[in-house]
Amino acid sequence: MNKQVYMDYSATTYTKPEVLEEMLPFFTENFGNPSSLYSFSDKTKKAVNLARERVSKALNAEKNEIFFTSGGSEADNWALKGIAYANKKKGNHIITTKIEHHAILHTAQFLEKEGFKVTYLPVDEEGFVSVEDIKNAITDETILVSVMFANNEIGTIEPIKEIGELCKEKNIYFHTDAVQAIGHVDIDVKDMNIDLLSMSAHKFYGPKGVGALYIKNGVKIQNLIHGGGQERGKRASTEDTAGIVGLGKAIELAMENMPEENEKLSNLRGRLIRGIEARIPEVKLNGPKDMSRRLPNNVNFSFIGIEGETLLLDLDMNGIFGSTGSACASASLDPSHVLLSIGLPHETAHGSLRLSLGAKNTEEDIDYVLEVLPKIIKQRREMSPLWEDYMKNKEEK
């Protein structure tokens, strides 16, 4: 296996050299606890403050509205549990969608066991939630609406501004999981009426294990982690200075590079989509067909008569790394909840492949995938009873 092509940037990214360079002194030289009062900790305090400033600038938020966490999952947990527990006297109803990340869905299911009511809204065949459906689901008990900014599997960019306006009008808190959106979509929490927003550094070329939750001033929220008085009394635990510095630098670079990077990724995405559709019969592009409403790095196809896990292994043997819509990492054989939610039959959802592009991908990478993938699909279909049945049924029709 000579050539290696990584196309799973929605799962994680590498840490950019400029980010690592800024982080390194905080492991060995400037290691003071940012909460300590002596002058030795001044550099760490300043570094954490600078990172907070960089994040707030990227979102058009205030500095004191940014709270650092251990990642996107913690931020999502904090947003849902924190709002639910702090506002239960006002109401006990939460609205979300069926295609959220498991950090939202599993937290919502946990809250249901705690006595909260959760409405899981459907989406259309491209993954869009209807603002009208949200409006119709709101009751006197509704305290929170949580809708992801952009979907991690099929790249759908949701109508966040319209949802924000509705929530403001109804006086309901609005949270968005923006883990996939940072660096790809313009975000303005004021203009979009967002009350809470989650992010994770490792999705935009920062380190793993650090994220942030934006909490608009005045939002009533309970702490998730209790202990010391860090993060202005809202989130206990000694600050991960190096990680926070990395997040701050990474988001600054993501904002600077966004127009150029998005153009490059959109062009590569177009080349890949057109190439697959031209070379492989009976394929279905999952997610929005209008590319302006889709993440610029997202490609997700279903291949009739193919098992996703087998396809991944075949690609791996050829040095291509992507992901599947199947829950191959768990004991479950159920396909992706996202693909089922957009109406795909089980067997179609099982044969799905997500290729998510990033900074190091080139046209040569795309062409290599277009050389290898059709051969694998052809070979696997020749051995597939699913494909045989499908073609037989098609001929009969």
From Swiss-Prot:
Question: GO MF terms on file?
Answer: 2 iron, 2 sulfur cluster binding; cysteine desulfurase activity; metal ion binding; pyridoxal phosphate binding
An example GO CC term for this entry is: L-cysteine desulfurase complex
Q: Where does pyridoxal 5'-phosphate bind?
A: G72, S73, N152, Q180, S200, A201, H202, T238
Return the EC number: 2.8.1.7
Under which pathway is this protein filed? Cofactor biosynthesis; iron-sulfur cluster biosynthesis
Q: Does the keyword Endoplasmic reticulum apply?
A: no
As its record notes, the protein acts as a catalyst of: (sulfur carrier)-H + L-cysteine = (sulfur carrier)-SH + L-alanine
Q: Where is the active site?
A: C328 (cysteine persulfide intermediate)
Q: What cofactor requirement does the entry state?
A: pyridoxal 5'-phosphate
Metal-binding among the record's keywords? Answer: yes
* Classification via Gene3D superfamilies: 1.10.260.50, Aspartate Aminotransferase, domain 1, Type I PLP-dependent aspartate aminotransferase-like (Major domain)
As for subcellular location, the record says: Cytoplasm
Which keywords appear in this protein's UniProt record, sorted alphabetically?
2Fe-2S, Cytoplasm, Iron, Iron-sulfur, Metal-binding, Pyridoxal phosphate, Transferase
Q: Which GO terms describe its biological process?
A: [2Fe-2S] cluster assembly; amino acid metabolic process
* Positions that bind [2Fe-2S] cluster: C328
Give all N6-(pyridoxal phosphate)lysine modified positions. Answer: K203
Say what the protein does: Master enzyme that delivers sulfur to a number of partners involved in Fe-S cluster assembly, tRNA modification or cofactor biosynthesis. Catalyzes the removal of elemental sulfur atoms from cysteine to produce alanine. Functions as a sulfur delivery protein for Fe-S cluster synthesis onto IscU, an Fe-S scaffold assembly protein, as well as other S acceptor proteins.
Entry-linked NCBIfam families: FeS_nifS, PRK02948.1
Q: How does it assemble?
A: Homodimer. Forms a heterotetramer with IscU, interacts with other sulfur acceptors.
Q: Which family does it belong to?
A: Belongs to the class-V pyridoxal-phosphate-dependent aminotransferase family. NifS/IscS subfamily.
Protein name per UniProt: Cysteine desulfurase IscS
Q: Which gene encodes it?
A: iscS
